């Protein structure tokens, strides 16, 4: 199968490239550089937007190196661009759309980039490849906040640019597409708020090491789920997590 993966150098995308590249012909669209807002900046609560410190830079570089090695030799063509800017003039059997801002907290500081990367990116894909089914990575943030267990019929609503953009993007998907709403994916290659980076930061300032408890799914299990979806394609919208 010929598969285009947007955001193929990102956390989720790189793991998908590594796994699917063993069986399928993979192309990557990814415009990443070190000026990417999620790589360069961090939100520090009341302090607002700041550039990453030395510890955060170290972990981002380590995880970038991990992802680069993860995709090496597993794809056919790499197109260094964003999906809302340019797309390859080729035909594909499937598109997996991972290419967008992944740091929801930063959407308040970069609303235009949030909309472009999430909404305009998918608009471009749907216009450029109208007959190709899309596996779209959305987010549980389309639900806003909730208590208890929810299903896919739970009402949508969000108070931030990220969640609202994800809701808008979902409306662009059609009857042949699959939408996934993961709650939190963790694992190697995640350079944002990885558990080991948070531990490193707490130790550096002599504070207790605290690990937040939340519903989540390990990246390898998420990839397995996507492979099963591809093998048994059933269009629709699905929540995905361990405790969802």
Region spans (language model):
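Conserved Rossmann-fold NAD(P)-dependent oxidoreductase catalytic core, especially the SDR/UDP-sugar
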Residues: 97, 123-159, 178
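Short alpha-helical oligomerization interface
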Residues: 104-121, 151-158
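Active-site helix of classical SDR
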Residues: 161, 165
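NAD(P)-dependent short-chain dehydrogenase/reductase
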Residues: 148, 159, 171-223, 227
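Rossmann-fold scaffold of SDR-type NAD(P)-dependent oxidoreductases
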Residues: 6, 93-98, 136-137, 239
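Conserved internal alpha-helix within the Rossmann fold of NAD(P)-dependent oxidoreductases
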Residues: 121-125, 170, 226
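Mid/C-terminal beta-alpha module of Rossmann-like enzyme folds, strongest
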Residues: 225-244
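N-terminal Rossmann/SDR dinucleotide-binding element
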Residues: 1-94
């Amino acid at each position: 199968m010929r598969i285009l993966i947007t955001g193929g150098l990102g956390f989720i995308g790189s793991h998908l490239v590594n796994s699917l590249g063993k069986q399928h012909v993979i192309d990557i669209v990814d415009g990443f550089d070190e000026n990417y807002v999620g790589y360069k900046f961090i939100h520090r609560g009341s302090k607002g937007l700041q550039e990453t410190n030395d510890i955060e830079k170290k972990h981002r570089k380590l995880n970038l190196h991990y992802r680069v090695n993860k995709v090496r030799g597993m794809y056919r063509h790499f197109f260094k661009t964003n999906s809302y800017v340019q797309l390859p003039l080729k035909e594909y059997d499937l598109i997996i759309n991972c290419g967008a801002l992944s740091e929801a907290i930063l959407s308040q500081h970069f609303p235009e980039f949030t909309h472009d990367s999430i909404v305009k990116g998918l608009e471009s894909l749907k216009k450029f490849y109208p007959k190709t089914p899309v596996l779209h990575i959305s987010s549980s943030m389309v639900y806003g906040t909730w208590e208890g267990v929810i299903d896919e019929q739970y009402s949508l609503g969000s108070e931030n640019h990220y969640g609202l953009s994800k809701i808008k993007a979902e409306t662009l998907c059609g009857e042949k597409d699959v939408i996934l709403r993961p709650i939190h994916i963790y694992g190697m290659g995640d350079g944002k708020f990885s558990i080991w980076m948070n531990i490193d930061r707490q130790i550096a300032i002599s504070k207790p090491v605290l690990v937040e408890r939340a519903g989540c799914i390990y990246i390898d299990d998420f990839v397995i789920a996507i492979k099963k979806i591809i093998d048994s394609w059933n269009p629709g919208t699905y929540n995905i997590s361990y405790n969802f």
